[in-house]
Amino acid sequence: MSVLGRRGAGLAARGATLAPLATASYLIRPFSALNRPPPKYPGHVPLTFFERGALAVGSAVGSLMNPRRADLIAALGEATATPYFIYRLRDAMLSDPTGRRILRDRPRITSETLKLPYLRTLPENSVGRTYATWLDREGVSPDTRNSVKYIDDEECAYVMQRYRECHDFYHAVTGLPTFVEGELALKAFEFLNTLIPMTGLSIFAFVRLKPAERERFFSLHLPWAVRSGLASKELINVYWEEILEKDVDELRKELGIERPPDLREIRKLMRQQQKREKERLQGKS
């Protein structure tokens, strides 16, 4: 056999040996960045197990460093919601008549769908007016919520989107503000109500609170979150768009939500007390 013939035979044998290895490698790694399955809905980004883990760790660290990074908090929520927790929330909706209607209708919460100018004309203690007043006071908009993209199941992606867009209603009904102390209190409440891991992980941001804020969180608002979170009905099954004219006190009673201590008023009183104490000390000097 010629040299070229022997070389060709060797290459053929090597190819036969490597073929099973290549097949095994393909089975171990279902897809790569260059061979990714098509998205299952607009904006969907499929992730491998390791990519999802890296996203969870990176977004957790980043959001702890800067709790105002809504994009990182959103990514953390999606990366840690599967495979179990978002399905549990979806099943909670499927087991409830109103939840099933929400899944069928798939409403979206935006400034257009809610008609904010109309909400501002509703009675002062109505759900819609309370919501609009809270948005105006906090300077936020329902149009700023990130779209879900890292959850594979299309229906579960909507469930996460619904939770995300209802978050400001939870703020409005409880009266909790958007600064870190208020967000932590609401996240603790949401964790016990929804079991979404991100809401529980967010509580670790208490390390960024000042000593007085930390003491207040653990003595006042965390106990409130535990009581209300365990006692309240599944908030994901509230069809907010249909109860905008309802009395907010009546709604809290129906849902089993206790009104938390007014955080803004507490901070205001503490500032006044500190000011008086400072003036008293200056008067002595």
From Swiss-Prot:
Residues 1-31 form a transit peptide. It comes from the Eukaryota. The keyword Cytoplasm does not apply. Pathway: Cofactor biosynthesis; ubiquinone biosynthesis. It is found in: Mitochondrion inner membrane. Its EC number is 4.1.1.130. The keyword Mitochondrion applies. Zn(2+) binds at residues 167-168, 171, 183. It is a peripheral membrane protein. Its main location: mitochondrion. Keywords: Lyase, Membrane, Metal-binding, Mitochondrion, Mitochondrion inner membrane, Transit peptide, Ubiquinone biosynthesis, Zinc. Its cofactor is Zn(2+). GO terms for biological process: ubiquinone biosynthetic process. It catalyses: a 4-hydroxy-3-methoxy-5-(all-trans-polyprenyl)benzoate + H(+) = a 2-methoxy-6-(all-trans-polyprenyl)phenol + CO2. GO terms for cellular component: extrinsic component of mitochondrial inner membrane; mitochondrion. Belongs to the COQ4 family. HAMAP family: Coq4. Lyase that catalyzes the C1-decarboxylation of 4-hydroxy-3-methoxy-5-(all-trans-polyprenyl)benzoic acid into 2-methoxy-6-(all-trans-polyprenyl)phenol during ubiquinone biosynthesis. Component of a multi-subunit COQ enzyme complex, composed of at least coq3, coq4, coq5, coq6, coq7 and coq9. This is Ubiquinone biosynthesis protein coq4, mitochondrial.
